[in-house]
């Protein structure tokens, strides 16, 4: 009887230890998952401004070496890589959408061609396949360029960027540039002489009214700023035009895809709509990138003039 009791106690003891061990394993796994989730979540919160601050902090530690760069130059480079990644991520999403349309069109065209009951020719099928191949090639190039952009950006902040989700990229948005003229920009940046001479009543003496002392602007610097300003305004005009063209080609693409799905469309017209939308939308995104980078370059030049003075 005693042996039976002891064996029962032993079994209960073993079961208790097993349950405790299992509980500890589950607790450990949960803790690890929470830590990984927290790390991943924190990685997605790095905004453009935070990237700039991190890069400036890391750059300041290199003052004693030849790797140090002026702060305005670092800020410009960070913005350039950030805008590049932001643009190419959107272009990649668009390319994947076009890839799906091409794949679906190729499969349907092959069925029609093999059945011999439709108007799809060998040439039509070849064009769709070439369009698909070209889109797949674009996807490879964009994924490569995004990887390079992450490496370059990570080098500036001295931190590895593992994935695009580590930085807070959004849909590319044209930067707000409210200045209506170059003189308006110079006044806003206090780069225009504001001192005026007012002649006295007798015309012999003159009084000088001084406003806030403006930053000196040489003719050479004025020319550099004006060229950069023109780059911003021309890019802004292209963004406006590209936005209109994108809406037109998007509507055309939706119409051609729907027609082809219902069996009333033409493979040649679908091919042209896919190619046209790819070109127009990609060009529109490039125009946003060029505008944002041009504005960043103008800011860099302006800040460098402040620094020299």
Language-model-detected regions and their locations in the chain:
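Sec/SRP-type N-terminal targeting helices
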Residues: 62-75, 96, 121-123, 127, ...
């Amino acid at each position: 009887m005693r042996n039976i009791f002891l064996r029962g106690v032993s079994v209960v003891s073993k079961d208790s230890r097993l349950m405790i061990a299992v509980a500890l394993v589950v607790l450990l796994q949960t803790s690890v998952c929470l830590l990984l989730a927290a790390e991943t979540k924190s990685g997605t919160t790095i905004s453009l401004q935070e990237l700039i601050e991190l890069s400036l902090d890391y750059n300041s530690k290199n003052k004693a070496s030849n790797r140090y760069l002026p702060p305005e130059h670092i800020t410009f480079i960070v913005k350039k890589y950030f805008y590049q990644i932001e643009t190419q991520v959107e272009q990649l999403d668009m390319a994947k959408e076009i890839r799906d349309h091409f794949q679906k069109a190729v499969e349907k065209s092959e069925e029609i061609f093999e059945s011999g009951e439709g108007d799809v020719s060998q040439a039509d099928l070849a064009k769709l396949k070439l369009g698909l191949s070209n889109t797949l090639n674009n996807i490879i190039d964009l994924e490569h360029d995004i990887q390079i952009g992450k490496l370059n950006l990570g080098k500036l902040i001295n931190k590895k960027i593992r994935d695009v989700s580590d930085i807070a990229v959004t849909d590319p948005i044209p930067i707000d540039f409210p200045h209506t003229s170059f003189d308006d920009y110079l006044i806003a940046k206090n780069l225009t002489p504001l001192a005026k001479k007012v002649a006295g009543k007798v015309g012999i003496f003159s009084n000088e009214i001084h406003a806030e002392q403006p930053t000196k602007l040489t003719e050479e610097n004025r020319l550099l700023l004006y060229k950069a300003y023109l780059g911003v305004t021309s890019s802004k005009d292209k963004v406006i035009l590209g936005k209109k063209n994108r809406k037109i080609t998007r509507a055309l693409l939706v119409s051609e895809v729907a027609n082809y799905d219902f069996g009333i469309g033409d493979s040649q017209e679908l091919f042209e709509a896919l190619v046209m939308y790819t070109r127009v939308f990609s060009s529109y995104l490039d125009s946003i990138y060029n505008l944002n980078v041009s504005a960043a370059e103008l800011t860099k030049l302006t800040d460098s003039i402040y620094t020299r003075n």
